[in-house]
Amino acid sequence: MLITPEKLYKQRRNFLKLGAGALISSSVLASKLSALNFTSDTNPNKLEISDEELATNYVNFYEFSTDKRKAVSLAQNFNTQNWKIDISGEIEKPLTLSMEDILKFPLEERIYRFRCVETWSMVVPWVGFELRRLIEMAKPTSEAKFVKFTTLLDKSQFPDQDALFPTIDYPYVEGLRMDEAMHPLTLLAVGMYKKALKPQNGAPIRLVVPWKYGFKSIKSIVKIEFTKEQPKSTWESYAPSEYGFYANVNPNVSHPRWSQANERALGDFFTKPTLMFNGYEKEVASLYKNMDLKVNF
């Protein structure tokens, strides 16, 4: 079930165009976000939005650190000036987008559930635009079956990338099937809580796929590639018996080391049952018709 109703989540809130040659910094984006005319009732189901302080400070961003609190601290000097996103692969013509280009897409707020594979969860008001808008602009060919995403590789900014023994292989890579990428729930986010994304939350731009575990929602994207073959995602490569390509939230498929049947919302003491597809079963179940979700996890 959608948290934000169709009528509201399809409303578009446009940014004013920035002047030619302007640098797109977090502070500039924050000022644009604060000027947006958000509607007062974007959560008619009255689900409790997670505390902003908790949601922005309890994070997984291994490029900075495997320690959630330390990652927040180390992220504070992250430089996103002059950010570029290369778009390539099975498309009519490769292109590079600046954040100025990105901010030309109509932005909107969407309130989504977010479920981590570690069994914690939250409800976040994201600001962004549907990924399919960018895909339509890129004009993929009939050969494009998947979309591959890559996080920034910069050892000068990411301590774990520069470590003698990095925690995982970098750069971080994720992927979606084309129909998943084109689904209207799939979002490219530039903000949350009506503010620009903080560095630890994936600034300046990240993916949000609300029916999948959080590790699919790749942060700080610098490359989007359209491919013929299914890309090998980072966690799938690291531990294929524990992390599958699809990573759909499924209370009936346990992680090898823990159950996924329940979750604990940030700030709560008690757990609650995990919803199939994180509560978006009606919207996305048809994408996986006739698939064995215990095999394709």
Curated annotation (Swiss-Prot):
It is an enzyme of class 1 (oxidoreductase). The keyword Zinc does not apply. GO terms for cellular component: periplasmic space. The keyword Signal applies. Mo-molybdopterin binds at residues 62-63, 116, 151, 201, 206, 217-219. Pfam families: Oxidored_molyb. Its cofactor is Mo-molybdopterin. It catalyses: L-methionyl-[protein] + a quinone + H2O = L-methionyl-(S)-S-oxide-[protein] + a quinol; L-methionyl-[protein] + a quinone + H2O = L-methionyl-(R)-S-oxide-[protein] + a quinol. Belongs to the MsrP family. Heterodimer of a catalytic subunit (MsrP) and a heme-binding subunit (MsrQ). This is Protein-methionine-sulfoxide reductase catalytic subunit MsrP. It comes from Campylobacter jejuni subsp. jejuni serotype O:2 (strain ATCC 700819 / NCTC 11168). The gene is msrP.
